[in-house]
Amino acid sequence: MPSPARKFEKRPTLDNLVEKVDAQRPGAITGDTIPTGYGSLDKLLGGGFRRRDLILLGGDVGSGKSALALGIALRVAQQSPGVAFLSGEMNEERLMERALAIEGRVAVDELRAATLTDQTRAGVGGAAVRLRGLPITFLPLAGEDFETVFERLDPLRQVGLVVVDYLQLVPPPRERTTQDEDTALVLRHLKALALNRQVALLVVAQLPGFNAARADQRPTLNDYGVLGAPKQHADVVLSIFREEMYNPGGGVDGATELLVSKNRNGPTGFVDLYFYRRWMRFEDMLDPDR
């Protein structure tokens, strides 16, 4: 005797997803996607970062990790999603100083020494006007434990992107026996934080396994160390490679490869950026629509 046909239950999540796809205009990005403001990167990532994703950004010392993280934060804020930027190395004044340099295309030392020309002063003035109304909040990455640090996000509303600079300064939820175990535990909790708060979480990371003496200095996933945790918990891994750091005078000043070493929901590869070191500003090297 044939068994009775199985009656499938309704799946509201599936139904909602299908409705969303049907309603989406061709080429439009989904509502949970947050463009980074760097067109070439957004194109490779299918529109940008996605809410609930954990994104790592690593690179050698002095490669511009914090500058790129701040540049992304500013560009996201200009598109209206709120941004929270937690820094373990700079207070709000120093971060705003860097933001003025990036947006005003002026060197930080000129800001500090007040040696601005009429042209750069005008650039700073215009940058100040743009920055004043941006929905970006700077917070200290300091506290006795993980929960204390991230409770500071509770009063914030409409936040789409949270930036943490940097991973190794985040206090672990509880003490483990080694630094690697602490960092792996922090990554697991950061991923849970992204899921629970429905934000894209961009985390700057040092590379404990990086060796600048090797033949190819492009960072790899193995350079992130920490018991393979990035491979397990990160949805996207971005790595900065600037050849001028290893080949000075080689005619490649400013040229930057931003490697997408892991992309859970799409392709890997790299995009070409240009780094204006005096301004700590990254720009797309090529038209992303080419």
Predicted features and spans:
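The Walker A/P-loop phosphate-binding site
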Residues: 2-106, 288-289
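Hydrophobic positions in the central parallel beta-sheet of the AAA+
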Residues: 55, 137, 162-164
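Conserved H-loop
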Residues: 88-90, 199, 204-206
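Helical hairpin unit composed of two closely spaced alpha helices linked by a short loop
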Residues: 160-203
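Short, well-ordered beta-strand core segments
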Residues: 83, 201, 237-239
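Cytosolic-facing regulatory segments adjacent to core modules
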Residues: 43, 75-158, 172-173, 271-274
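Helical mechanochemical/support elements of P-loop NTPase systems and associated helical scaffolds
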Residues: 13, 37, 68-69, 91-95, ...
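C-terminal regions of RecA-like/P-loop NTPase motor modules
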Residues: 11, 61, 146-162, 189-197, ...
